[in-house]
Amino acid sequence: MKLKKMNLPYISNTYDVRKIMFLVVLSCIPGLCTEIYFFGCGVLIQTLLFVIISLLFEIIILKMRRKNIKNSLFDYSSFLTAVLLGLSTPCALPWWMIIFSCFFAIVISKYLYGGLGQNIFNPAMIGYVVLLISFPVHMTAWNEKNSSLSFYNDIKKSINLILFYNKLNNSKKKICPDNFTEATPLDDFKTKSHFDYDFFPEESAVKKKTKIVSIAWKYINISFLIGGCFLLYKKVICWRIPLSFLSSLIFFSSITYFYSQKFFCSPLFHLFSGGTMMCAFFIATDPVTTSCTKIGKIFFGLIIGFLVWIIRNYSDYPDGIAFSVLFANMIVPLMDAYLKTSGYGHKNL
């Protein structure tokens, strides 16, 4: 019998970095399938393009740094970043925007700080925020799937939009009901809350399409909730961050909702709109950019939930997931410094 030599401490760990990243990517499949069902095959094509470009950027950086490409490339960290970017951005973005986002996510946010384990900001959220600030019109265009198209025609149309032509390239867009239908439920509610009358009262088609998009986001969030429960069951992520984030969002949204149901969304609406569930289980739980302590993880989730509530209600951005996560990433070193625990047998300071 051949014995395996091990160093102290003798603690078995069933999950390495590669397996953790693989399980997280696997848990994204329900959300990916749901987005494809509601928004078309452009989601899949765009996600694959994000993956290919991200891996190419990583290969270039590893070559420049003379690192082992096989070990670094197949830890699935950049693969996961690309998948999260593909799922969080509207489908049919132009190819050059995808390259722009991947450059900031992989080169700037990850390898400029030293690579995996050294970055202080979530790479996927950096890539998302860069697109949101630079191209806000494209980032709010969530078009529903054309049910009249076949599977082949849907793929062909998506490839043409991404690689050759994009209908949003026109700098001048007229304000019409067709533009309104591209809004997410959070966009829709924020627009209507500024008016005392019904926006486009006679446009029944607009209301119908807006309702379809609202239903789509509910099922998308439920799909990510299922994937998140799988990660909790496999003990890949810690329960403290999702629980504290969702509890904070429910608490603050309940206060404003009971104050005025006309101008503020209900807690249930906040939970199943935008990227709430994706943030709770897939983005905020990034082990590199979150706090190392148990109490720090709770504060981390509470801060994100509070900031999401603030941005959704009082800013021009309909969803504040990315900005909230990045701001919380900034204060993680401060939390780890003041919330660190002492060693065994010593009193906490």
From Swiss-Prot:
It is an enzyme of class 7 (translocase). The complex is composed of six subunits: RnfA, RnfB, RnfC, RnfD, RnfE and RnfG. Part of a membrane-bound complex that couples electron transfer with translocation of ions across the membrane. Belongs to the NqrB/RnfD family. It is found in: Cell inner membrane. It is a multi-pass membrane protein. One of its GO terms (biological process) is transmembrane transport. This is Ion-translocating oxidoreductase complex subunit D. The gene is rnfD. Its EC number is 7.-.-.-. One of its GO terms (cellular component) is plasma membrane. Its cofactor is FMN. The chain crosses the membrane at residues 20-40, 42-62, 83-105, 120-140, 212-232, 236-256, 263-283, 291-311, 319-339. The modification FMN phosphoryl threonine is found at T184. It comes from the Bacteria. InterPro entries: NqrB/RnfD, RnfD_bac. Keywords: Cell inner membrane, Cell membrane, Electron transport, Flavoprotein, FMN, Membrane, Phosphoprotein, Translocase, Transmembrane, Transmembrane helix, Transport. Pfam families: NQR2_RnfD_RnfE. Its main location: membrane.
